Design a protein with these regions (language model features):
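Residue-level marker of regulatory loop/turn positions in helix-turn-helix DNA-binding domains and
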Residues: 88, 109, 141
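N-terminal helical cap/lid subdomain that shapes the substrate entry/recognition surface
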Residues: 2-94, 101-102, 113-116
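Proline-centered loop/turn at the N-terminus of a beta-strand
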Residues: 105-107, 182
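Asp-based, Mg2+/Mn2+-dependent phosphohydrolase catalytic module
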Residues: 1-9, 113-114, 118-203
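Generic structural signal for small/hydrophobic residues in well-ordered secondary structure
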Residues: 10-13, 53, 99, 108, ...
Length: 203
């Protein structure tokens, strides 16, 4: 069995908090309307289309046509997306720093829209610690599709079984295990740190 010497992270809900409500709770004071908006108008499922590579302006225009009374809030999704990401997950960025200080090669595979990534990436110097990051919206491949893991192995130059992939989504974890990676289903930074210590990647 190969030794695990590389670590591959997901970004949202592993390194950074993410929820559409973080933005829209600032704009929509009525809780019932807020829940309607994030379950029927700007929803995680609709947002996922941008993760998969669909153009943001096309998505927004289509949604505004369908829900014209919400045009301003739909526009805010496009212009204020970084506010859906309030900050890092407790303890996760410290793990990245500790791995980097031990010269463990670091990578990421993230379901993230290309245009939103261009806005978010420069705000977070932690990503300078990573050798490469695969962004779904750029590649037009998304987790848990096997093709995105195949691309990662090829582009990162990794042999199957030599990297552990960390994701909060169970389906993504299962697919990673079926496509060349060891995998950790992320719940919190403490349990992740324990696993990385067990793998001798951290002390």
């Amino acid at each position: 069995m190969p030794k695990i010497t590389n670590v591959v992270f997901d970004v949202g809900k592993v390194l950074f908090e993410w929820d559409l409500r973080h933005l829209f709770a600032k704009l929509i004071t009525d809780k019932g309307e807020l829940e309607y908006f994030v379950t029927h108008v700007v929803t995680p499922e609709w947002h996922f289309q941008h993760d998969a590579g669909r153009a943001l302006d096309e998505m927004v225009a289509e949604r505004v046509a369908e829900f014209p009374k919400y045009a301003a809030w739909i526009a805010a999704y496009a212009s204020r997306f970084n506010e859906t990401i309030p900050g890092p997950i407790t303890g996760s960025l410290e793990i990245v720093q500790d791995l980097a200080e031990r010269d463990v090669p670091l990578y990421a595979i993230t379901n993230f829209g290309a245009e939103f990534w261009d806005d978010f990436r420069p705000t977070q110097p932690i990503f300078d610690r990573f050798q490469d990051i695969i962004v779904s919206g750029v590649e037009k491949l998304v987790k848990p599709e096997p093709a995105i893991y195949a691309l990662a192995l090829q582009r990162f130059g990794l042999e199957p079984g030599t990297a552990i992939f960390i994701d909060d989504n169970h389906d993504n974890v299962i697919s990673a295990r079926e496509n060349g990676f060891a995998a950790h289903h992320f719940k919190d930074a403490d349990s992740l740190r324990r696993e990385l210590i067990a793998l001798d990647l951290l002390h």
